[in-house]
Design a protein with these regions (language model features):
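DNA replication initiation on ssDNA origins
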Residues: 1-84
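Catalytic micro-motifs at enzyme active sites that drive phosphoryl/nucleotidyl and oxygen chemistry
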Residues: 72-78, 102-119
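A broad structural signal for short, well-ordered beta-strand segments within beta-sheet-rich domains
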Residues: 80-83, 93-94, 112-114
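Histidine-centered divalent-metal-coordination microenvironment in nucleic-acid enzymes
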Residues: 88, 113-140
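Short, surface-exposed ligand-recognition loops at beta-strand->loop->(often short) alpha-helix junctions
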Residues: 89-98
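Helical (often loop-to-helix) elements that flank the catalytic cores of nucleotide-handling enzymes
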Residues: 102-105, 130-158
Length: 158
């Protein structure tokens, strides 16, 4: 299984790469040489939960755990393969106790694939495994889209 990672470079061009789940988890376990996450977390208390204006945020990488994508000749993302993962993002967890409580709860669920702290230090990202009624991950984009919509409807009230 691979995650798709995108970013916009300084020439405003979409860059696309894929990383195995193992490589991705190794990579997020430590900060980069510019201490991007550390500096961001220091700035978070000064912001009002609106991170879009944080310096350099547009150059940050964006991760798509739900599916693998490639880029076509026009620079658009094109679906390749579904990973059968839904991302749940729990926000505004202000204390370690709140984060630990959510981590403990999701660790007890058999469908939890992974859970990790968000870049802001105040959120938890949980990847949940999903499949269709036959226990399979859809191979076609339209089928995957329907499965993701169904899964979203089931968990949006959490």
């Amino acid at each position: 299984m691979k995650f798709t990672i995108t970013r916009i470079n300084k020439q405003n061009k979409l860059m696309v790469s894929s990383k195995t789940v193992e490589r991705f988890l190794e990579r997020i376990a430590k900060d980069d040489a510019k201490l991007s996450v550390t500096n961001f977390r220091m700035s978070v208390p000064l912001m009002e939960a609106d991170y879009q204006y944080y310096k350099g945020i547009k150059e940050w990488q964006h991760v798509y755990p739900a599916a693998e994508f490639n880029k076509d000749e026009s620079g658009n993302l094109v679906f390749q393969k579904s990973n059968g993962l839904v991302m749940l993002h729990f926000i505004n967890l202000m204390s370690d106790q709140e984060k630990d409580a959510v981590k403990k709860t999701v660790s007890l669920l058999p469908m939890t694939f992974a859970a990790f702290e968000g870049a802001d230090g105040r959120s938890l990202i949980v990847l949940v495994s999903i499949c269709n009624e036959e226990g399979k991950i859809p191979t076609k984009e339209a089928d995957a889209d329907l499965l993701y919509q169904s899964a979203y409807e089931q968990v949006k009230t959490l």
